[in-house]
């Protein structure tokens, strides 16, 4: 499925991880080890005793209630939202969010990861996974106050399709 007009290639051992399965496996493992997994919740406050964080206060966006949870260890694993939680702890960090869009195709066109050998740019990797493949990603800076309001644009879809076809023309169909 590679573009027949490619004039050169380098074989590089590469692979991919299914992020959905990895996330599900991490959640299941955490639950097996006693974790309580919460979704649709926002940390609003860190609960401290003698200067140490002993829990969190959160807002549950489903029940519309505030809840408190206590634990011997509190871990900030909030990804891009981690800046807010770090600020609650008095740690000032500046994260620089970037929006990355990708396209997932309902069919697979390649059996190996295809990367472009160039400086990182939009749509420079085609990744197979089970019965699908994906092309991505775009990367554009985003103001921190807009991280909860991201949408894929038609221009991004067009760019991903156009650039993806250069790796595998079959993506045009």
Predicted regions and their residues:
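Active-site substrate-recognition segment that forms the wall
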Residues: 68-69, 77-173
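Short strand-connecting beta-turns/loops that link adjacent beta-strands
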Residues: 49-52, 63, 119, 131
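Flavin (primarily FAD) cofactor-binding/catalytic cores of flavoenzymes
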Residues: 29-32, 41-43, 60, 166
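Helix-loop-beta segment of a Rossmann-like dinucleotide-binding subdomain
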Residues: 1-33, 55-57, 138-148
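A conserved short coil-to-beta-strand element within the FAD-binding core of flavoproteins
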Residues: 39-55, 59
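A structured beta-alpha segment of the ubiquitous adenosine-cofactor-binding alpha/beta core
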Residues: 57-68
